[in-house]
């Protein structure tokens, strides 16, 4: 059976991205491969079964475009209101907290979005129902 192990994103400023993911989501380097032209840095925390791979092409000077295919990466937290306030306090400018309901009034998700230094959208969901 196949197992999802990582998702890769390209970053323009590796140090800035590392600071963001460590500060925002408590992700730390689990493995790093440095080559002459590029580096691969894998991030995870104690709760994660998979990793985010940051690929840094050292000669790149222009920001990456995300096209119209990329959606977002998602993290779940115990309390989305507290996480939202923390992101605001850190200056990460999160979007407003929203709720998603079924056709009636049952809460399906409580969430907000924030962007990393390269503009990748990240959804932060409160642990609830499907989102554990």
Place the predicted regions along the sequence by residue:
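Vicinal oxygen chelate
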Residues: 11-14, 65-121, 132
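Active-site beta-strand termini and strand-to-loop segments that position acidic
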Residues: 43-47, 114-117, 127
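Short, charged/polar surface micro-motifs in flexible loops or helix N-caps
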Residues: 46-50, 59-61, 78-82
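Core segments of cupin and vicinal oxygen chelate
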Residues: 2, 8-51, 105
């Amino acid at each position: 059976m196949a197992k999802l192990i990582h998702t890769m994103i390209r970053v323009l400023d590796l140090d800035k991205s590392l600071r963001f993911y460590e500060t925002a989501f408590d992700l730390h380097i689990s493995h790093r491969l440095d080559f002459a032209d590029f580096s691969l840095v894998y991030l995870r925390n104690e709760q994660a079964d998979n990793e985010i791979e940051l690929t840094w092409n050292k000669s790149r000077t222009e920001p990456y475009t995300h096209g119209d295919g990329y959606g977002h990466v998602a993290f779940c937290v115990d309390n989305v209101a507290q996480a939202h306030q923390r992101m605001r306090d850190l200056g990460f400018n999160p979007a407003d907290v929203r709720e998603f309901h079924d056709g009636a009034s049952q809460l399906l998700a409580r969430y907000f979005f924030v962007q990393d230094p390269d503009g990748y959208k990240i959804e932060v969901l409160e642990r609830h129902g499907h989102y554990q």
